[in-house]
Amino acid sequence: MKALIFAAGLGTRLRPLTDDRPKALVEVAGRPLLQHVVDSLKRQGVDEIVINVHHFADQIIDYVEHKGGFGLKVHISDEREQLLDTGGGILKARRWLEGSEPFIVHNADILTDIDLRAMYSSHIASRADVTLLVASRVTSRYLLFNTDRRLCGWINKSTGQTLPEGVEYAPGVYSELAFGGVHVISPSIFPYLERFSREQKFSITPFYVANCDSLNIVGWLQPVGTGWLDVGKKESLSAAESMFG
């Protein structure tokens, strides 16, 4: 099983911790976030990973080498020249992720004990092109799903912005679910990504919404009783220490 770890971000929400290191190397319970994510993916059967890098890229590359590649097959997707955002990051890593099997995409600042093998199996069983980890959680931005939990749109409750732009979503018609920073993706999306990308840098969310009629993009609900934390912000670090220490 393959996985792409997003480790290229600037980590602005974690400053000043990220003034001298990449977000992926900020420590929780004595181990970098990257190590937590890699260990979790290894336990769940991942044997090949791609790590994208930009901010303090050399530190991540040195860490991977120091760890002997974590005992995995590791590829570095180098974005030092330009940070490509999530959609551009997936497309740049295409050469390592193409094939017949789906792959996992996991943010480096997401810590969870969710059984991603169950999510992966659900993805295959449903014949989805993309499966997104989602939860009923208070946030400002929501993915919108129909009764079959198929993606239909996106809304920012703070600004009123919607995707597709200008669409007015009637209250109560769609399930509003928060995205959890983990995707399972089938390589079937790559031709669609190529056609969508006018520039190298682009976000994956507008792509998903623009293609939700053509691709089977579904939500997979976080199981009750499982742990999940976005450690991309300082206020979550102490909670992460308690949960994963």
Where are these regions (language model features)?
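N-terminal nucleotide-binding beta1-loop-alpha1 segment
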Residues: 1-19, 44
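Conserved N-terminal catalytic core of the sugar/cofactor nucleotidyltransferase
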Residues: 2-5, 27, 31-107, 116-118, ...
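Active-site metal-binding loops of divalent metal-dependent hydrolases
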Residues: 10, 108-110
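Hydrophobic packing residues within well-ordered alpha-helices of enzyme cores
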Residues: 14, 60-64, 193, 240
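Catalytic-core segments of class I nucleotidyltransferases/pyrophosphorylases
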Residues: 101-104, 111, 117-124, 137-138, ...
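A short, conserved acidic/glycine-rich loop-to-beta-strand motif
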Residues: 126-136, 141
